[in-house]
Swiss-Prot record:
The active site is at 127 (proton acceptor). It catalyses: beta-D-fructose 6-phosphate + ATP = beta-D-fructose 1,6-bisphosphate + ADP + H(+). It holds the Pfam family PFK. It comes from Bacillus licheniformis (strain ATCC 14580 / DSM 13 / JCM 2505 / CCUG 7422 / NBRC 12200 / NCIMB 9375 / NCTC 10341 / NRRL NRS-1264 / Gibson 46). It is found in: Cytoplasm. This is ATP-dependent 6-phosphofructokinase.
Length: 319
């Protein structure tokens, strides 16, 4: 294999640039040319493709977002769209592709694999919801962004003796809510993977108030429901002054943490190794700090699960 491509797709995550950098430099180290595909699968269809050199990925390892830009592309879900993409890959002589993104991006890589085109998926999403890997690129940075916000909100919550509901990202996965809630000392954590008892949450807040607690923090993953609505229900039921903070897209931005930069570098380079070994249709990950790879079709058939022991711990510590 003498020429590969790389693209970022779906929602951006801090560390994607570090992964792109690793792909480019690892490939060039092995005398393999690399072509960057801009705007994800949309750029693959439209032909927004250019050759990348070592200098093309200089000064990006510390930057959030993605140099290659990203987009969602419904057209790639059609046979016609994929045929256009494959035609462009052939036009540029690209023999293998590294796809950096979440499960939607993996689905595109799966479709290309079924067309006989070698692809390797690299998990890039703040949601940490890709099976087959302990961590995804961007999760640690997003987690630290949320914890920083929790700490600052707790300061003002204490000053005004208020309850705060903080809504974080996670439509289908509660990892950001669970990890940040545990690290931030939240009184309650609501995630999509677990049922919640509103009466118990209210009772817990009342018990805390009765023993002199001056403030409370509740973390709600967006997939559970509106943080604003939870705030209204809590204030009505407890008569405690309650405020809501929806963190939103700030969770996707920012300079990646050292952990994300290292993870992205390892996974990006490993993806290139697999392509050069002729192993397409795979996706990479890290488990117990060891690099691993799996069949991408099998991973897409699996469902992300929450760490139940961590969830139990969060409940035990929030009494």
């Amino acid at each position: 294999m003498k020429r590969i491509g790389v693209l970022t797709s779906g929602g951006d995550s801090p560390g994607m640039n570090a992964a792109v950098r690793a792909v480019v430099r690892k490939a060039i180290y092995h005398d393999v040319e690399v072509y960057g595909i801009y705007n994800g699968y949309s750029g693959l269809i439209s032909g927004k493709i250019e050759k990348l050199e070592i200098g093309s990925v200089g000064d990006i390892i510390h930057r959030g977002g993605t140099k290659l830009y990203t987009a969602r592309c419904p057209e790639f879900k059609t046979v016609e769209g994929r045929e256009k993409g494959i035609a462009n890959l052939k036009k540029y002589g690209i023999e293998g592709l590294v796809v950096i993104g979440g499960d939607g991006s993996y689905m595109g890589a799966k479709k290309l694999t079924e067309h006989g085109f070698p692809c390797v998926g690299v998990p890039g999403t703040i949601d940490n919801d890709i099976p087959g890997t302990d961590l995804t690129i961007g999760f640690d940075t997003a987690l630290n962004t949320v914890i920083d916000a929790i700490d600052k909100i707790r300061d003002t919550a204490t000053s005004h003796e208020r309850t705060y509901v903080i809504e974080v990202m996670g439509r289908h996965a509660g990892d950001i809510a669970l990890w940040s809630g545990l690290a931030g000392g939240a009184e309650s954590i609501l995630i999509p993977e677990a049922d919640y008892d509103m009466e118990e949450i209210i009772a817990r807040l009342k018990r805390g108030h009765e023993r002199g607690k001056k403030h409370s923090i509740i973390i709600v993953a967006e997939g559970v429901g509106s943080g604003v609505e939870f705030g209204k229900r809590i204030e009505e039921a407890t008569n405690l002054e309650t405020r809501v903070s929806v963190l939103g897209h700030i969770q996707r931005g920012g300079s990646p943490t050292a952990a994300d930069r290292v993870l992205a570098s390892r996974l990006g380079a490993f993806a290139v190794e697999l392509l050069l070994e002729g192993k397409g249709g795979r996706c990479v990950g890290i488990q117990n700090n060891q690099l691993v790879h799996h069949d991408i079709i099998e991973i897409l058939e699996q469902k992300h699960t929450i760490d139940q022991s961590m969830y139990r711990l969060s409940q035990e510590l929030s009494i």
